[in-house]
Amino acid sequence: MFVDRQRIDLLNRLIDARVDLAAYVQLRKAKGYMSVSESNHLRDNFFKLNRELHDKSLRLNLHLDQEEWSALHHAEEALATAAVCLMSGHHDCPTVITVNADKLENCLMSLTLSIQSLQKHAMLEKA
């Protein structure tokens, strides 16, 4: 039961991160830039969630099958890549940042696929 709650919590946190990343990418494409504070806040949240995913996936190791394990690692990778991407883009202006929206979109796609895989696996377990 405890393991199921941890899985659900991780899945919900990943979904929230995906929503945040999708909103950021959409705004970045519309404006052409983002504020440094927005980027730093999102980056810090992604690094924190990445660390939590890593720690919790190690604790859940005995309760995860290969597909779940792989999906969690792909999600970790997508979050880390997005966070690193958010560190780039500082140019002449200290208050705005122009990160690579294409890289962030790739991270968003990878994160979405990982979440879908985890959701599919959760539905199969309930059945």
Curated annotation (Swiss-Prot):
Disulfide topology: none
InterPro entries, alphabetized: Biofilm_regulator_BssR
Domain of life, per lineage: Bacteria
GO BP annotations, alphabetical order: regulation of gene expression; regulation of single-species biofilm formation
Pfam families named among the record's database cross-references: YliH (PF10799)
Disruption phenotype: Cells show increased biofilm formation when glucose is present in the medium. In a continuous-flow system with M9C medium supplemented with glucose, the biofilm had a 290-fold greater biomass, a 2700-fold greater thickness and a 31-fold increased surface coverage than the wild-type.
Signal peptide: none
Protein role: Represses biofilm formation in M9C glu and LB glu media but not in M9C and LB media. Seems to act as a global regulator of several genes involved in catabolite repression and stress response and regulation of the uptake and export of signaling pathways. Could be involved the regulation of indole as well as uptake and export of AI-2 through a cAMP-dependent pathway.
NCBIfam families reported for this sequence: PRK12302.1 (NF008959)
Protein name: Biofilm regulator BssR
